[in-house]
Amino acid sequence: KTGDTVSIMAFNTPEIFEAHYSIPMVGAVINAINTRLDPNTVSYILQHSDAKVLIVDRQFHDVIEKALKNVKNKITIIDIEDQDIDTSSFKKIGELEYESFLNTGDENYEWKKPKDEWEAISLGYTSGTTGNPKGVVYHHRGSYLMSTGSATAWNMPNKLNFLCVVPMFHCNGWCYPWTLAMLHARVICLRNIDVKKMFELIDKYEVTHFGGAPIVLNMIVNAPKEDQKALKRKVNVLTAGAPPPSIIFEKMEKLGFEVMHVYGLTETYGHMLQCAWNEDWNSLEKDKKNEIKARQG
C-alpha cells in the first residue's frame, strides 16, 4: 500500500530498472540494497526499513537466507531468475518468481501519482560509515530535479544509448533510471563489470553515455588489447566516487572516451558538482588539462 517499502537486491538487470517505476507507481518506496553487503547488514536494512516485499536475484540466495533468519517483520519474497545466465546452482528463495508475478497483474491498473511532491520515492542506505548504515529518504521533488538537472548539466540529447554501469543501488544509479525515460533513451543493462563485455555492448548498441567509478576506468585503460574494441564514435563518461589519477583522463581520451569528473553524496541524490570544461583551457599543456579535469567542480 501507499508508503510501504519494497526492497530489491539485484544486479543491473531489467528488473531493477523496472522497479524504479513500478514501485513508485503503486505509491510504495523503493529500497535498492547494496549487493556487496554481508547478511547482518542486509538483515538490519530489511528490519529498519520495515520492508514488506523483497525482490531478489537468486544469486544472492546464501546472503538472503542468512539475513532473513534475523528479520522479524514478515516479508513477501519475489525471486529474479535471470534467463541470460546459468542459474542451476542458485537456490529458490521465495514462493514467487518475478516474471510469473508480473503476469498476474491487472493490465487496466491506474498508477498512483503522489499527492504531494515531498512524498518519499526512495529509501537508500549509506555505506562505509561507522555503526549501522544510515537511511536516506529521497522525495519525488528531489528525484525529479536531479533527473532533469543531470540531463541539462551533461548536455544529454534525446534517444541516446546509455550503458548502466553504476549500480542502481548506488543513489538509485545517480537517478539516471528516471532521466533516461525522459530522454527516450535506449537502456543497455550490464549485470557485472566485465570490460570485454562492456566493449562488446558499446560496439553493438553504439553506446553514447555511461557513468563509472575511477576503478572501472582503470580496468578499461588497462584491459588486454584483445578485449578492447575501437570506438565508432565518442563515448561520454561521468566518473565519481574517488579521486581519479589525472593520467586516467589522458588514457581514456586516447581510447575515444570523453570523461567528466563529478562529486556527490547519497544525501544529494548523487553528483551535484562537476568539472564543466572551459574552452579557454584547450590551449593548455596536456598535463595541466588533465590536472583540471581531475577536479570535481
Residue ranges and their predicted role:
Residues A10, A28-L46, R58-I64, V165, ...:
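ATP-dependent adenylate-forming carboxylate-activation enzymes
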Residues Y21-V26, H48, H170, A181-M182:
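Short hydrophobic alpha-helices that are characteristic scaffold elements of the AMP-binding
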Residues M25-S100:
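Structural core segment of the AMP-binding/adenylate-forming
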Residues I78-D79, F90, G94-L96, L102-Y125, ...:
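Conserved pre-ATP/AMP-binding loop-to-beta segment of ANL
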Residues N103-N108, S122, V136-P157, V165-F169, ...:
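Conserved structural elements of the adenylate-forming
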Residues Y144-N161, F169-H209, A223-P224:
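Conserved AMP-binding/adenylation subdomain of ANL enzymes
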Residues M182, V207-G212, V221-A294:
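Gly/Ser/Thr-rich phosphate-binding loop
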